[in-house]
């Protein structure tokens, strides 16, 4: 058994990491896409060295890697732990101002002095958090629990393992940049992360264990128009904005994120940018089933062809589709120990595992494409990518307990 986790130390570590502005930039051509990610990477390198880890390195892409050898000759497995440095570009992560709510009593939580609030009317999970310590923002930025809670939990677990000399297997650690924009993992040094399997610590509610995720692609559709003075435009103007609006109407109205859950896929119009002369629509394509995923991509291709044939445009609309990541399950299913170990660890600390698909992606999906099984473990956070993001300190403590229990590698 480990001694009780010092919640104050865990909280302070998390708050310190949140102070780094690490928001990624979607259109970046290099990684890391923001300076703050490298600054946080250097801070983590310093701490990992202090903890006594070996081969602690930061690449020019801000990928942090480190190794902690087993302290028990009977524990021969090598387990990896992964979290990402960046925060989502969908909501500002600069100058995060926090509030720590001790012993949440239920009801609405006012965020700062503005009109933003978090309510159990909209977020029913809040009823489960009564009595816990919650960390929220002032309602002007996201929190950054995704994924700095995961970083803090990994670092706290490593600190405890070393302080208390708890028997553990070989441990690989990696902190990656630009997970939110799908860029950083492309520069991941697999040769420095040799392990039997790994876990991303990037999930949400306590108990979550995820090893299925969307197949994902991004489609960009470009429209070209012709601008003329509006007073003399009859028969001459071609409005690319109007063309784009018309094209958007061909998509099934119920196959969107706000109307789907579980394993249902969707199309998501993520961005609409341009003017009369040129417009670009950006769509996210998501589906768990590989065949359905292929059909979704084919649907967009067919609609572009039909639209061009119908309009007879001098400059036809253009389509570019790029795959982002694949469902990790095809790899994880061949390493069932990765799921069994996480299950046992949760049960050992009194947590009921909740197996569920990820309606998104993690670095684990990219690692799986390289042949490394990498399920996802909860962090205790909620409402990621939004001003309503929050994390439970008790949930974070639970994650630390599960990480330590997994690294004991019992019965493997």
From Swiss-Prot:
InterPro entries recorded for this chain?
ArgE/DapE_CS, Bact_exopeptidase_dim_dom, Peptidase_M20, Peptidase_M20_dimer, Peptidase_M20B
Instruction: Report the PROSITE patterns cross-referenced here.
Output: ARGE_DAPE_CPG2_1 (PS00758), ARGE_DAPE_CPG2_2 (PS00759)
Key words, A-Z? Aminopeptidase, Cytoplasm, Hydrolase, Metal-binding, Metalloprotease, Protease, Zinc
Q: What is its EC number?
A: 3.4.11.4
Instruction: Tell me which residues bind Zn(2+) 2.
Output: 146, 180, 385
Its recorded reaction(s) are: Release of the N-terminal residue from a tripeptide
Q: Where in the cell is it found?
A: Cytoplasm
Manner of cofactor binding, per the entry note: Binds 2 Zn(2+) ions per subunit.
Needed cofactors: Zn(2+)
SUPFAM superfamilies to which the protein is assigned, alphabetical: Bacterial exopeptidase dimerisation domain, Zn-dependent exopeptidases
The catalytic site is made up of: 86, 179 (proton acceptor)
One Pfam family from the record: M20_dimer
Q: What is its main location?
A: cytoplasm
User: So where does Zn(2+) 1 get bound?
Assistant: 84, 146, 202
Q: Which CDD domains match?
A: M20_peptT (cd03892)
Q: What protein family is recorded? A: Belongs to the peptidase M20B family.
This molecule's function is given as: Cleaves the N-terminal amino acid of tripeptides.
Please state what the protein is called. Answer: Peptidase T
């Amino acid at each position: 058994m480990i001694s009780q986790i010092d919640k104050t130390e865990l909280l302070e570590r998390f708050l310190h990491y949140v102070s780094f502005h690490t928001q990624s930039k979607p259109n970046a051509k290099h990684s890391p896409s923001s300076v703050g990610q490298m600054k946080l990477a250097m801070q983590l390198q310093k701490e990992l060295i202090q903890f006594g880890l070996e081969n602690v390195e930061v690449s020019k892409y801000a990928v942090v890697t480190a190794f902690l050898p087993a302290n028990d000759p009977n524990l021969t497995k090598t387990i990896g732990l992964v979290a990402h440095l960046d925060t989502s570009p969908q909501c500002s992560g600069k100058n995060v101002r926090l509030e720590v709510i001790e012993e949440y009593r239920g009801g609405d939580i006012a965020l700062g002095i503005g009109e933003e609030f978090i309510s159990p009317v909209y977020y029913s999970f809040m009823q489960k958090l009564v009595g816990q310590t919650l960390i929220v923002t002032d309602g002007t930025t996201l929190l950054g629990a995704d994924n700095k809670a995961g970083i803090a939990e990994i670092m706290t677990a490593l600190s405890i393992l070393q302080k208390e000399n708890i028997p553990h297997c070989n441990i690989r650690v990696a902190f990656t940049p630009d997970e939110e924009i799908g860029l950083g993992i492309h520069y991941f040094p697999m040769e420095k992360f040799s392990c039997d399997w790994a876990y991303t610590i990037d999930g949400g509610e306590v108990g979550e264990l995820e090893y299925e995720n969307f197949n994902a692609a991004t489609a960009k559709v470009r429209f070209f128009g012709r601008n003329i003075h509006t007073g003399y435009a009859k028969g001459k103007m071609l409005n690319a904005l109007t063309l784009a609006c018309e094209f958007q109407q061909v998509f099934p109205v119920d196959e969107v994120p706000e109307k789907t859950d579980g394993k249902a896929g969707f199309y998501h119009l993520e961005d609409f940018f341009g003017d009369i002369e040129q417009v670009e629509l950006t769509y996210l394509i998501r589906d768990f089933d590989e065949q359905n995923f292929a059909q979704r991509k084919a649907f967009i291709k067919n609609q572009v062809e039909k639209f061009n044939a119908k309009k007879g445009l001098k400059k036809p609309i253009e389509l570019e589709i790029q795959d982002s990541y694949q469902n990790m399950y095809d790899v994880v299913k061949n390493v069932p120990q990765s799921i069994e170990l996480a299950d046992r660890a949760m049960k050992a600390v009194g947590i009921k595992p909740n197996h569920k698909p990820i309606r998104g992606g993690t670095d684990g999906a990219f690692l799986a494409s390289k042949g490394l099984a990498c399920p996802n473990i909860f962090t205790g956070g909620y409402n990621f990518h939004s001003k309503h993001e929050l994390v439970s300190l008790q949930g974070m403590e639970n994650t630390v307990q599960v990480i330590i229990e997994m690294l004991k590698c019992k019965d493997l």
